[in-house]
Regions:
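Short, conserved beta-strand element in jelly-roll/cupin
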Residues: 47-51, 61-78, 117
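Short acidic-glycine-tyrosine-enriched beta hairpin
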Residues: 82-97
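Short beta-strand His + acidic residue motifs that chelate non-heme Fe in jelly-roll/DSBH
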Residues: 57-59, 78-79, 95, 101-108, ...
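Short strand-connecting beta-turns/loops that link adjacent beta-strands
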Residues: 37-38, 64, 108-110
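A short hydrophobic beta-strand segment most commonly corresponding to one strand
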Residues: 45-48, 94, 109-126
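Short, charged/polar surface micro-motifs in flexible loops or helix N-caps
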Residues: 37-41, 50-56, 75, 122
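A short, N-terminal "cap"/entry segment at the start of jelly-roll beta-barrel domains
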Residues: 1-43, 58, 128-142
Length: 142
């Protein structure tokens, strides 16, 4: 029998293995619901917090998953193709499968926060995550 999975988002630990070498700079990321938490097969639901200053999720894409990002706190810019799109609390951005994108907190004093999700994949590995400019030419798609 399949059961409902319930969790309090504030009780979900941040991912300890996501850092600058994979494009996650000055930020914490929670995978609230995914293949490992809740047994999802086609969806990831998460929260990201970006420290004031130079925090960002660098240019990346996921060939197997669409993504939405709902800005719940602060402001920043969404990196999209050759564009930098200003966003603030209340804005939602959507990225199609395979589209290069990222996010940068533009405030020197305020944290930015987003609720984000992937549709079409239930983990970073199955999403086909790829960093645009990998550190030292390494492949970070796994």
């Amino acid at each position: 029998m399949k059961e409902t999975y319930k969790v309090n988002i504030d009780e979900v630990p941040a991912q300890p293995d996501l850092g600058p070498d994979q494009g996650w700079v000055g930020m914490t990321v929670q995978f609230v619901i995914d293949a490992f938490n809740g047994g999802s097969e086609h969806l990831v639901f998460g929260r990201a917090r970006f420290a004031p200053g130079q925090s960002e999720h660098q240019w990346h894409r996921h060939e197997n998953a669409e993504e939405f990002a709902y800005i719940t706190k602060g402001e920043g810019i969404v990196l999209d193709g050759d564009n930098e799109i200003p966003v603030k609390a209340g804005d939602v951005a959507f990225h199609q499968k395979g589209a290069w994108h990222g996010f940068r907190n533009t405030s020197a004093t305020e944290e930015a926060e987003m609720i984000w999700g992937w549709a079409g994949a239930a983990s970073k590995a199955t999403a086909g995550y790829e960093l645009r400019y990998p550190a030292h030419g390494e492949d970070h798609s796994h």
